[in-house]
Amino acid sequence: MEIEKLLEQVNWEKNNGIVPVIVQDEKGEVLTLAYMNKEALRKTLETGIAHYYSRSKGRIRMKGEVSGNIQTVKEIKIDCDNDALLLIVSPKGPACHTGNYSCFYRKLGEPERVLPIDYSLSILKELEEIIKRRKETPVEGSYTSKLFKEGREKIYKKFGEEAIEVLVAEKRERIIYEVADLLYHLLVLLTYNDISLGEVMNELRRRRK
């Protein structure tokens, strides 16, 4: 069936153009609860990779765009009221930002599992490599590739917007979340200018002397 006809089956009007999406792996384990607007579902259908709509950021992102933990979509189901979706996916890596396989990894009332802090900063190097690949070999539906396509003005604007998000964040968890976004957009800005993270590290070492 044509993509546009599939999109028409969803009741977008009920929740202001956004529908909840339950995500399961092929064994039936629930991985996360996400959201889609029409464009996110379109990108998912076109690419076969899960794209979700961030209500807090007001934008679409491919799952795993930054982490590499993409979700290949095997099947999409719709509920009886046509206002919720179920994605059956093959995940590459954990679904949760905490590093857990599923976002539903604890019972109600259980304390949060705190992951050990990694001070190696190796994740920044890994992220830099992913961003470089998106620049050199654009991927359809990739947020990073889209930034490079739109060019300098868009990249610098997004970096500025993310810096403001850090400044206005009040809660500890929100500050961590926004700083992570800021670091990602900083790496995009550096990569756009063909500046490596290593060069910045060398400058910091020089200043320490």
Curated annotation (Swiss-Prot):
Gene Ontology MF: a single term: ATP binding
Organism (species): Pyrococcus furiosus (strain ATCC 43587 / DSM 3638 / JCM 8422 / Vc1)
Keyword presence, Zinc-finger: no
Entry keywords, A to Z: Amino-acid biosynthesis, ATP-binding, Cytoplasm, Histidine biosynthesis, Hydrolase, Multifunctional enzyme, Nucleotide-binding
Name of the protein described by the UniProt record: Histidine biosynthesis bifunctional protein HisIE
UniProt-annotated location(s): Cytoplasm
EC number assigned by the record: 3.5.4.19, 3.6.1.31
Family under the similarity heading: In the N-terminal section; belongs to the PRA-CH family. In the C-terminal section; belongs to the PRA-PH family.
High-level lineage: Archaea, Methanobacteriati, Methanobacteriota, Thermococci, Thermococcales
One Pfam family named in its UniProt record: PRA-PH
Primary localization: cytoplasm
Keyword Nucleotide-binding applies: yes
Gene3D superfamilies: MazG-like (1.10.287.1080), Phosphoribosyl-AMP cyclohydrolase (3.10.20.810)
GO BP annotation list: L-histidine biosynthetic process
Stretch list, region Phosphoribosyl-AMP cyclohydrolase: 1-123
Pathway assignment: Amino-acid biosynthesis; L-histidine biosynthesis; L-histidine from 5-phospho-alpha-D-ribose 1-diphosphate: step 2/9; Amino-acid biosynthesis; L-histidine biosynthesis; L-histidine from 5-phospho-alpha-D-ribose 1-diphosphate: step 3/9
Annotated InterPro entries: His_synth_HisIE, HisE, PRA-CH, PRib-ATP_PPHydrolase-like, PRib_AMP_CycHydrolase_dom, PRib_AMP_CycHydrolase_sf
